[in-house]
Amino acid sequence: MTDKSHQCVIIGIAGASASGKSLIASTLYRELREQVGDEHIGVIPEDSYYKDQSHLSMEERVKTNYDHPNAMDHNLLFQHLQMLKAGKPIELPVYSYVEHTRTAQTVHIEPKKVIILEGILLLTDARLREEMNFSIFVDTPLDICLMRRIKRDVNERGRSMDSVMTQYQKTVRPMFLQFIDPSKQYADIIVPRGGKNRIAIDILKAKISQFFE
């Protein structure tokens, strides 16, 4: 039986790669943390749950379609969400974008009153949707997402522009159209214009603040 005193509220934020999901999640976390304290709110990125590929060569790892639901260990994520809701801590995997696999390290996460979950494929999995108290889809035009992705992956993840463009054409855009964009039908709130939509962020803050009352 779940201990209601530890009941964890899960808020899902989905959308295309480089749509502004992480910016919205980090802004909500930072501003709400100032109000309620770090012990009451946390963020979990879906990227942490990319499957372990340590058994594959680097050549094989780079061929993985990272925008397909099969690239994600949603079974483990689902298990972790259930544990947090039951008042139990989890060991969050740590994923290396350079090595294209999990590292040996984990991050200890204690249950929080509110967990903000963000990632591209969250709403494609019915089990994850069931665990969310409410969900958000960040709806940003693909051309803007591409420009942001090039800047981010080249500057922050050690990628070449050619590799980013090839991946975008082969997997990112097709998988967005096949899986991610259709999943926005499941969102409770759709946020246009990405992470700098201040009005939307204020509305979301007000909604999330209700869970701390």
From Swiss-Prot:
E.C. designation(s): 2.7.1.48
Q: Name one GO cellular component term.
A: cytoplasm
Which reaction is the catalytic activity of this chain? Answer: uridine + ATP = UMP + ADP + H(+); cytidine + ATP = CMP + ADP + H(+)
Localization (cell)? Cytoplasm
Q: Where, by residue number, does ATP bind?
A: G15, A16, S17, A18, S19, G20, K21, S22
Concerning InterPro entries, the annotation shows: P-loop_NTPase, PRK/URK, Uridine_kinase, Uridine_kinase-like
- A molecular-function term among this protein's GO annotations: uridine kinase activity
Write out the pathway annotation from the protein's UniProt entry.
Answer: Pyrimidine metabolism; CTP biosynthesis via salvage pathway; CTP from cytidine: step 1/3; Pyrimidine metabolism; UMP biosynthesis via salvage pathway; UMP from uridine: step 1/1
List the keywords (alphabetical).
ATP-binding, Cytoplasm, Kinase, Nucleotide-binding, Transferase
- Keyword Membrane applies: no
Any one of the GO BP annotations: CTP salvage
User: Where is it predominantly found?
Assistant: cytoplasm
Any single Pfam family the record assigns to this protein: PRK
Domain of life of the source: Bacteria
Checking PANTHER family in the record gives: URIDINE KINASE (PTHR10285)
Q: Which NCBIfam families match?
A: PRK05480.1, udk
Q: What family name appears in the similarity comment?
A: Belongs to the uridine kinase family.
Q: What is this protein called?
A: Uridine kinase
Record the organism: Cronobacter sakazakii (strain ATCC BAA-894) (Enterobacter sakazakii)
**What gene makes this protein?**
udk
